[in-house]
Design a protein with these regions (language model features):
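Short phosphate-coordinating micro-motif centered on Lys-Gly-acidic
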Residues: 2-4, 92-96, 102-148
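Phosphate-binding P-loop
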Residues: 21-28
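AAA+/P-loop NTPase substrate/partner-engagement loops
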Residues: 64-83
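Conserved lysine of the Walker
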Residues: 41
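N-terminal pre-Walker A segment at the start of P-loop NTPase domains
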Residues: 1-20
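The conserved Walker
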Residues: 37
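Hydrophobic anchor at the beta1->P-loop junction of P-loop NTPases
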Residues: 31-33
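Post-Walker A helix-loop "phosphate-sensing" segment adjacent to the P-loop in P-loop NTPases
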Residues: 50-63
Length: 148
């Protein structure tokens, strides 16, 4: 796994980082977000999704929320899907299979909160592991690693 970034950021810095990341997001990329409750996983994903729409000259989605209860929220971006998963309540890989999780990784962009059950799996795709640690009420330490 190759470390790409290790920064301490406030919200404005997170906005800038999300804008820069979006310029390099490719179809098939998988982003795994780790961090304690309240670390900013959903906030970071919300910024990424909004920026993807802006970069494609499309109106931002009216609402981007955490899929803790539905487990998956899908956003349509031109001819592809953005999948936003929250695996906090998922207890087994069988549950993921029932959601067509592994099939959905192909030809889409996928953001996953609470990916711990996936870390040791061979995802067969480029993926990024993003760890958010709370430093203070307004600052987060963000580590981004890339794996092919």
């Amino acid at each position: 796994m190759q470390k790409l970034s290790n920064q301490i950021l406030d919200f404005r810095g997170l906005e800038k980082l999300s804008t820069n990341l979006c310029k390099n997001i490719s179809v098939g990329d998988i982003y795994l977000f780790q961090g304690e409750l309240g670390a900013g996983k959903t906030t970071f994903i919300r910024l990424l999704i909004n920026n993807l729409f802006v970069l494609n000259n499309l109106p931002k989605p009216s609402s981007i929320t955490s899929p803790t209860f539905p487990i998956l929220i899908t956003y349509e971006l031109n001819s592809l899907q953005i999948y936003h998963y929250d695996l906090y309540r998922v207890k087994s890989l069988k549950e993921l299979e029932e959601l067509d999780f592994f099939e959905n990784l192909n030809n889409n962009i996928t953001f996953i909160e609470w990916p711990e059950m996936l870390i040791s799996l061979p995802l067969n795709k480029n993926h990024y592991l993003i760890n958010l640690d709370m430093i203070s009420e307004t600052k987060r330490k963000i580590n981004i690693c890339f794996k092919q």
